[in-house]
Amino acid sequence: MKKFILASNNAHKVKEIKEILKDFNLNILSLNEAGIDIDVEEDGKTFEENSFKKANEIRKYLLSKGESDFIVMADDSGLEVDYLNGAPGIYSARYAGEHGNDSKNNEKLLEELKNVKDDERKANFICVIVAVTDKGEKIVAEGKSYGLILEALSGNEGFGYDPLFFVPEYKKTFAEMTSDEKNAISHRGRALEKLKDNLKGILK
């Protein structure tokens, strides 16, 4: 069974990806599960640059260890708010200065949008996935979800900006959805669906 290494140890993200790719005959592993301890600096100017850098560094590491027959997948995702000219964008995870502090990031976003009218609170989540094979083949897949930023947190599921991201068609935030509902329409879910189509060609 081909190894499919996820360039992440984020438990929420790993669970989401494993659920969506469960129909493939792949041994899907997080970095911890694969015994890989590499910290790749995300200093790219775009989501794709960050994703490719992560995936390719891990690919090179695995090749140096004599590994073969594997795929490494990395994704970079973020929130783009129209009123803020696309911010926080590639800085979404560290918007408030400290990497991965969801509550502080949400607080900062609410502060930035204080007194901003509903029709100016449009936003989208974007996810860009890059998968590289041991032979250096590269697949890029992008997905987006569109919604509005609420004035207060709502819901207990998900992570990141999910409690503020309201999807009008569902009348729910990402944090109020079941994992199946969210996976069907989330930016990562949509990017992974595109990735699945591309993987079929590689896994024949």
Swiss-Prot record:
Alphabetical list of PANTHER family matching this protein: INOSINE TRIPHOSPHATE PYROPHOSPHATASE, INOSINE TRIPHOSPHATE PYROPHOSPHATASE/HAM1 PROTEIN
The molecular function terms of the Gene Ontology recorded here are:
dITP diphosphatase activity; ITP diphosphatase activity; metal ion binding; nucleotide binding; ribonucleoside triphosphate phosphatase activity; XTP diphosphatase activity
Task: Write out the function statement from the record.
Answer: Pyrophosphatase that catalyzes the hydrolysis of nucleoside triphosphates to their monophosphate derivatives, with a high preference for the non-canonical purine nucleotides XTP (xanthosine triphosphate), dITP (deoxyinosine triphosphate) and ITP. Seems to function as a house-cleaning enzyme that removes non-canonical purine nucleotides from the nucleotide pool, thus preventing their incorporation into DNA/RNA and avoiding chromosomal lesions.
GO biological process per UniProt: nucleotide metabolic process; purine nucleoside triphosphate catabolic process
Subunit structure, interactors included: Homodimer.
Q: Which domain of life is it from?
A: Bacteria
Q: Read off the lineage from the record.
A: Bacteria, Bacillati, Bacillota, Clostridia, Eubacteriales
| GO CC annotations, alphabetized | cytosol
Q: Which cofactor does it need?
A: Mg(2+)
List the protein's name: dITP/XTP pyrophosphatase
What's this protein's family per the entry? Belongs to the HAM1 NTPase family.
**Chain ranges passing through the membrane:** none
